[in-house]
Design a protein with these regions (language model features):
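Alpha-helical interface subdomain recognition
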Residues: 2-147
Length: 147
């Protein structure tokens, strides 16, 4: 279930990235597209990088699960990271949209609400951190498996 929740978070992140990129490409301010402003393109760059990292970790956790391997550590990591990335991406997307994105009927606003609840589903971020810490500190994990 944590892998599935991580996947949902990735979907939110992808949507947030797509909305933000489209809007930044379409919106003009001070005679140029806002995607040309460093604060906007830096936000977009980090959104895409974080999306890729969380997606790859989730794929890895799913692969472990598909191969009937223990994956509670990887699933917890994927859920924790993907949820945080979804929240950050949704927040950045709303920021790029400005007050327009804050309107309740706007998709950017909806994504922020969806990203918030993803942080709670299948265990809060604090619970995920506990799961990860317990596995890392347990005798069943050695240094070789973590790196």
């Amino acid at each position: 279930a944590r892998i599935q929740t991580a996947s949902r978070a990735i979907g939110i992140t992808q949507s947030a990235c797509g909305l933000a990129i489209k809007y930044a490409n379409d919106r003009h301010q001070f005679g140029k597209k806002i995607i040309k402003f460093p604060r906007v393109y830096n936000k977009l760059a980090m959104m895409v990088v974080e999306l890729m990292v969380s997606r790859q970790l989730t794929y890895y956790a799913a692969e472990q699960k598909d191969n009937n391997k223990r994956c509670d550590l990887e699933a917890g990591m994927a859920k924790l990271l993907s949820s945080r990335v979804a929240w950050s991406a949704a927040d950045n997307s709303l920021q790029i949209h400005g007050s327009y994105g804050y309107a309740l009927e706007h998709p950017a606003s909806r994504l922020l609400c969806d990203a918030r609840i993803i942080n709670i589903f299948e265990g809060t971020a604090e619970i995920q951190a506990n799961v990860i810490s317990r596995r890392i500190l347990s005798n069943s994990i050695n240094e070789k498996n973590i790196s």
